[in-house]
Regions:
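Helix-turn-helix
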Residues: 1-29, 33
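Residues in soluble alpha-helical coiled-coils and helical-bundle/repeat scaffolds
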Residues: 25-29, 33, 50, 54, ...
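Hydrophobic/aromatic residues within well-ordered alpha-helical segments
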Residues: 27, 34, 38, 42, ...
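A ubiquitous short alpha-helical element
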Residues: 30, 62-69, 95-102
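Hydrophobic alpha-helical connector segments
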Residues: 33-36, 44-77, 127-134, 156
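Amphipathic alpha-helical segments used for helix-helix packing
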Residues: 71-95
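Hydrophobic/aromatic-rich alpha-helical bundle segments in the mid-to-C-terminal region
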Residues: 94-98, 102, 116-166, 173-176
Length: 176
């Protein structure tokens, strides 16, 4: 967890090193607080009229919002990687990540259900499979962009094509 240190948090937040150490008595407490902060920034993105104007367009913007395409998102991705790398060795952190993922998948499943009922999404698309695929794709692309940065103009077509493949529209009945 070299990315999350008392000094780096103090520098980023504008707090004194002593204030950070007093607020977070252990590195584990600091890591958990950093994770909670990162999750809250994603939650704000999720709350902005989810699934609109279409599920497909919204998922594209959601994935792009989580990719390291600028300094702020790159920092968030680095924290995410550092936290997830630590999770197998920290049961409390692992439980927090698992709960967050389950909640996010549940919300994406609800949006998929709404899109199916509104005729936007093929009825055979399973919401859980869609949610897991979108999250796995976003994590994979984010990881690649950390070591091979690209700008949004380069990445957007890839995200659009992948989300389109994961969200097929209902097929039209044959003409008679």
């Amino acid at each position: 967890m070299s990315a999350v240190t008392f000094r780096s948090v103090a520098a980023e937040s504008g707090w004194s090193l002593g204030a950070v150490q007093k607020t977070f008595p252990t590195k584990e407490a600091l890591v958990r607080a950093t994770l909670a902060y990162a999750q809250s920034s994603i939650a704000v993105r999720l709350s902005a009229d989810p699934g609109r104007p279409t599920l497909r367009a919204w998922l594209v913007e959601l994935v792009l919002a989580t990719l390291p395409l600028d300094d702020a998102r790159r920092s968030a991705c680095l924290i995410g990687v550092a936290v997830s790398d630590r999770a197998p060795f920290d049961p409390e952190l692992a439980a927090s990540l698992a709960a967050w993922d389950a909640d996010l998948r549940g919300k994406l499943q609800l949006l998929a259900g709404r899109a199916r009922s509104e005729g936007e999404l093929h009825p055979d698309v399973d919401g859980d499979v869609l949610a897991r695929a979108v999250l796995a794709f976003a994590a994979g692309v984010a990881g690649q962009l950390l070591y091979e940065p690209r700008d949004e103009a380069h990445v957007r077509p890839l995200v659009q094509a992948t989300v389109a493949a994961l969200t097929p529209a209902p097929t039209a009945p044959p003409l008679e």
